[in-house]
Structures are given as C-alpha cells and as structure tokens.
Design a protein with these regions (language model features):
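Rossmann-like NAD(P)-binding element
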Residues: 1-38
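Rossmann-fold NAD(P)-binding glycine/threonine-rich loop
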Residues: 32-80
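Short beta->alpha connector loops
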Residues: 9-12, 69-71, 94-96
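Active-site-lining helix/loop region of Rossmann-like oxidoreductase modules
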Residues: 85-141
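Short, hinge-like loop/turn segments at secondary-structure boundaries
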Residues: 23, 46-47, 80-84, 130-133
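Generic secondary-structure signature for well-ordered alpha-helical cores
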Residues: 3-6, 59, 106-113
C-alpha cells in the first residue's frame, strides 16, 4: 500500500511494525498517542514527539501525524455537522506526503488543517500534553 495507517496500542508498536515490507517512500499516517490503554497511562518519551518515535520504527517512510486528536466514535460519525464539516489536524515534514493526506481527509468529508512540521504540529495534537486532543471543531460553510 502507498498509504498505511498505524493505530496500535503504544507498547505494541514495535511488534506490530516489525518484519513488514520495506517502508521506503510510503506514507505512514501516525494515528497513535503515547498512552497505554485502557488506563490512559502516559508513556515517557524523554521530550520527543511521538511521531519521531514512530518514524524510527518505519525507516524511510514519510510520516504524517493525523486522525489522532478525536475519539474513534467521533471520527466514525458523519463529518458534516452544525452547518459545516468537522476539522482534522495533520502535520508532517514531507510536503508531498502532507498533500496526499490532506486530499484523503477532504475526500472522506473532513476539513484538513496543516499544523506544520512534526516538531510543532505533532506536539499540538499529541495526547497527552497538546492543547488540541478532543477539540471537536467545525468549519462552517
């Protein structure tokens, strides 16, 4: 696949990603947060952004952080709401990869907002710690 979603319990990431085909050039959408479910216990990343940790596990992939700041039931609901469309944030270091993820976000009915590189946007939408998790925002048409 050209675009791969990664949404796995944080401590299971290394095992889930081990032994998979070459990542080179693929887009990996990091939909993870550094918590241990179901207790929502934060994982200490020593000041790193979680997407940097994911990038280390998918060498050569173009990582875009997205689909992680809203609960699953909100993501599964109709993106049209209150006279507008629900907002999804994304960030990444590769402009072409971000453009492809933005197109996917639009195609499924959401409004995408680019938060810049992973070092900035990843921190903004990372749970815990960022100000954007669970912010269910609507862009009015």
């Amino acid at each position: 696949a050209d675009i791969v979603f990664v949404a796995v319990n944080w401590t299971k990431l290394p095992a889930a990603l081990r032994g998979l085909p070459e990542w080179s050039g693929r887009i990996v959408i990091d939909a993870n947060n550094p918590i241990e479910a179901p207790l929502f216990k934060p994982v200490d990343l020593n000041g790193r952004v979680s997407s940097d940790v994911v990038a280390d596990l998918v060498t050569g992939a173009r990582v875009v952080k997205a689909f992680n700041h809203l609960r699953a039931e909100v993501l599964a609901s109709d993106p049209r709401s209150g006279g507008g469309r629900r907002v999804l944030f994304y960030s990444g270091n590769d402009g072409t990869a971000k453009a492809e993820v933005a197109a996917l976000i639009e195609k499924i009915g959401f409004v995408g907002i680019d938060l810049g590189p992973l070092a900035v946007g990843g921190k903004l939408m990372q749970f815990p710690g960022g100000p954007l998790p669970n912010q269910n925002l609507i862009k009015i048409n």
